[in-house]
Amino acid sequence: MRILLLEGITDVAFFIPILKKLYGFSEISCDGIIRAEKMGDISKPICLENEDVKLIVFHSGGKSKQKHALTAMLTAIKMGYLSNIKILGIARDIDQEHDVKNWTKSIIKNAGFEVKEGDKFLIIEDLNLKIAVLGIANYDEDDFNIPSFELKRELEAVITDMAKEISIIEKFKNSLESLSNDAERRLKPKDITHVLAIAKNFDGDSMSGLYRKFIEEQINNKNKVNFLLTLICILPCLTIF
């Protein structure tokens, strides 16, 4: 079995459609797979299956809680509450850290485990566990060419990039400039996603619903699928090895 640990609910809304529509996973019951009551305040699991691979998806309830969540998972694996876990994937916004792998190694060491670096994974030999690491939004500001834009290396930057590819940014260019002028600051990726909600006539009550709908639409229309496959390099690591 494999685990994918995400930051928050919007990350779940982004990754689950990709796992289902690009990698052929189906959602299954978690009964008999995991003892969720032993996982503390980590989110309820989402269990997926593709042929012989079972993948359990969690989120930590926010970036600041991901350190605690990863530590709790390593402890649960050690104690046997999570059994037969061969690979644990962790996806985290790069922000200003730039090196999510080093962040992950630090958490593992602080949890009391020795960690080695392999070709594709971090390796915890005591747990017979491989760690696959994905830093989300590895961009530079020059990648966007959006006036009055301030890059934050977060999931919303990926959504912004996809919106740019289908000309939504160009279509709402004047609105974005007016918004920047009114706010008296440069726009961040989260600001762009609110404009995307207007462009897509999305009237739901959460951004996670927008992300899920938008990703599904882009996959169905085969827009930037190659980009997604490149971005989500963690998923082949979770599903193939």
Curated annotation (Swiss-Prot):
Family annotation (Pfam families): DUF3226
Annotated InterPro entries: DUF3226
Superkingdom of this protein's organism? Archaea
Keywords of this entry: Plasmid
Name of the protein this chain belongs to: Uncharacterized protein MJECL12
Q: Which organism is it from?
A: Methanocaldococcus jannaschii (strain ATCC 43067 / DSM 2661 / JAL-1 / JCM 10045 / NBRC 100440) (Methanococcus jannaschii)
